[in-house]
Curated annotation (Swiss-Prot):
<feature type="domain" description="LRRNT">
    <location>
        <begin position="35"/>
        <end position="63"/>
    </location>
</feature>
<feature type="domain" description="LRRCT">
    <location>
        <begin position="314"/>
        <end position="365"/>
    </location>
</feature>
<feature type="glycosylation site" description="N-linked (GlcNAc...) asparagine">
    <location>
        <position position="56"/>
    </location>
</feature>
<feature type="signal peptide">
    <location>
        <begin position="1"/>
        <end position="34"/>
    </location>
</feature>
<feature type="transmembrane region" description="Helical">
    <location>
        <begin position="428"/>
        <end position="448"/>
    </location>
</feature>
<dbReference type="InterPro" id="IPR032675">
    <property type="entry name" value="LRR_dom_sf"/>
</dbReference>
<dbReference type="InterPro" id="IPR001611">
    <property type="entry name" value="Leu-rich_rpt"/>
</dbReference>
<keyword id="KW-0812">Transmembrane</keyword>
<dbReference type="GO" id="GO:0051649">
    <property type="term" value="P:establishment of localization in cell"/>
</dbReference>
<dbReference type="InterPro" id="IPR003591">
    <property type="entry name" value="Leu-rich_rpt_typical-subtyp"/>
</dbReference>
<feature type="repeat" description="LRR 1">
    <location>
        <begin position="64"/>
        <end position="87"/>
    </location>
</feature>
<keyword id="KW-0770">Synapse</keyword>
<keyword id="KW-1133">Transmembrane helix</keyword>
<dbReference type="GO" id="GO:0005783">
    <property type="term" value="C:endoplasmic reticulum"/>
</dbReference>
<dbReference type="GO" id="GO:0030426">
    <property type="term" value="C:growth cone"/>
</dbReference>
<feature type="repeat" description="LRR 5">
    <location>
        <begin position="161"/>
        <end position="183"/>
    </location>
</feature>
<dbReference type="Pfam" id="PF13855">
    <property type="entry name" value="LRR_8"/>
</dbReference>
Amino acid sequence: MDFLLLGLCLHWLLRRPSGVVLCLLGACFQMLPAAPSGCPGQCRCEGRLLYCEALNLTEAPHNLSGLLGLSLRYNSLSELRAGQFTGLMQLTWLYLDHNHICSVQGDAFQKLRRVKELTLSSNQITELANTTFRPMPNLRSVDLSYNKLQALAPDLFHGLRKLTTLHMRANAIQFVPVRIFQDCRSLKFLDIGYNQLKSLARNSFAGLFKLTELHLEHNDLIKVNFAHFPRLISLHSLCLRRNKVAIVVSSLDWVWNLEKMDLSGNEIEYMEPHVFETVPYLQTLQLDSNRLTYIEPRILNSWKSLTSITLAGNLWDCGRNVCALASWLSNFQGRYDANLQCASPEYAQGEDVLDAVYAFHLCEDGAEPTSGHLLSVAVTNRSDLTPPESSATTLVDGGEGHDGTFEPITVALPGGEHAENAVQIHKVVTGTMALIFSFLIVVLVLYVSWKCFPASLRQLRQCFVTQRRKQKQKQTMHQMAAMSAQEYYVDYKPNHIEGALVIINEYGSCTCHQQPARECEV
């Protein structure tokens, strides 16, 4: 074919000048990449995109050229051999996820220089050589999640200056090598969650100047030091949820632009007072489900930019140390979870923190100050119960006395009696509403029974009528018995004249006197 085209060009050049143009066009056509030779059986072709998915393939199709995209997901590939994709020099994306790949040779992706997206997730890969991604310097996205990687080669991502997204979730990675991401200057999203990381090196994330989102959740980290994230000037979201973190510290004094931090579900008992001063732009903070008992006033003062915070599920000690937190919450204008319960002391267990502060007068005058600060009168129960004229609890710094010692300043704020009256009214209203609600429930049950079971109600009514008749009969019998038991006395008035009664017999007369008598009728 090439010789024929060359002969035609020479012929046209000899006969007319326009042959030069035709020869140039022919040369251009020869330089264009060849179209795919044919669509393999059972695969789906869309132009220069080939989809061979869920076909139980054990090897990649052969004799493929000119493809821009190849999907071999949901098959039974077990290994990637060296030079397996050498004929796909125009390929821009390659999907190999959901196979059984356990071995990837170092030269498996040879000559795939134009590939920008590579997916190897949901396989059984245990290790990757340093040279695995070297033939693909234009990679933008790599997905290695849901494999069995235990370690990362120190130079695994060397040369990937255009990489923007890297997924390594759900592996068995125990350590992140120092400066492993040094060349990943464009990386914006990094996910190493659901692994087995126990610690972080100070320079593990060095070079990630454009990183905006970092996921380290569900690992085994026991300590968080903000010094482990140096120069991450573009980081906006840091997720450390569900680790085993007990303390949070910061050994470097520098400021970064973090806006969202998730530390929930850990075992945090202590946070350095200055730890949040390095994140002055923090807007969302999640500290729920930890072991915090109180929060230092200095930490609370550094939360000036927060708009949302979660603190539930901690072991709050509702003693004097809780006053600073209660005061801050009463003045906080953002969103926070209302389910903050006291874990100690015993008399306040299960009570809401703000309710306990008010009910037990924890922050009134006369108590000793904590941490060089004194909180004045009781913190109001809720913003909806606080009267307009009452003031919230105020945190006041101490001053120096005449002898140079620190003396607390107490400030008495009005509104205690009004708040107490409001609480009493609230209790009365709540009880009344509960009674009304109970009565309505009873009426509703009777109405539903009357509508759904009329025969049963008729029998029940007849039973009540019969019982009432029996009770009336019993009462009548008792009354008649009582009347018959009474004695009625009738005075007897004889017809003859009371006086002497003369009886005459053969011996003579006998005189006797007759006394009046009474007859008793029964």
